[in-house]
Amino acid sequence: MAEVANNEQQGPQFNIQRVYTKDISFETPNSPAVFQKEWNPEVKLDLDTRSNKLSDDVYEVVLSLTVTAKNGEETAFLCEVQQAGIFAIAGLTEQQLAHSLGAYCPNVLFPYAREAIGSLVSRGTFPQLNLAPVNFDALFAQYVQQRQAAAAEAPAEEANA
């Protein structure tokens, strides 16, 4: 009983057990010709997060970033990084846990992924690429709103069928 009471008094717990690169790729499909052209790139960033439960209160979160730089119609480089972390998270409500996995953990992982991308781009001898910070809290809130809107539409569609 004392142990259970002790755990309840501790409240929410969040520990980073490990941060690691799960997958990494850098491609320059049009080299060396791309280096001889005027550099005026259009850079596109795509990102995604996913999580899975490894055991009780232990989760893996993977932040996937894909950066594509096009110089005119040609792809100058394509850089993909999957930055992952193992997190011990306990004492949270379901909603708090979802926010932690969908926003807080990606916030922890993003600087590592940004550094990996910057390093890869630099090693490819392209000009330095500094990715702007990402507001994962806002992205998660948008995701929750979209899911709620989709859930509200689903019963309406069933009623009309």
Curated annotation (Swiss-Prot):
Do you know which InterPro entries this protein is assigned to?
SecB, SecB-like_sf
Which keywords does this chain's UniProt record carry? Answer: Chaperone, Cytoplasm, Protein transport, Translocation, Transport
According to the UniProt record, one GO cellular component term is: cytoplasm
User: Can you cite a GO biological process for this protein?
Assistant: protein tetramerization
Q: Which domain of life is it from?
A: Bacteria
The UniProt record lists the keyword Cytoplasm: yes
Main location (coarse class): cytoplasm
Pfam families for the chain: SecB
Q: Where in the cell is it found?
A: Cytoplasm
Gene3D superfamilies named in the record: SecB-like (3.10.420.10)
> GO molecular function, one example?
unfolded protein binding
Quaternary structure?
Homotetramer, a dimer of dimers. One homotetramer interacts with 1 SecA dimer.
What is the role of the protein in this entry?
A: One of the proteins required for the normal export of preproteins out of the cell cytoplasm. It is a molecular chaperone that binds to a subset of precursor proteins, maintaining them in a translocation-competent state. It also specifically binds to its receptor SecA.
Q: Which protein family is named in the record?
A: Belongs to the SecB family.
What is the name of the protein in this document? Protein-export protein SecB
Q: What is the scientific name of the source organism?
A: Shewanella pealeana (strain ATCC 700345 / ANG-SQ1)
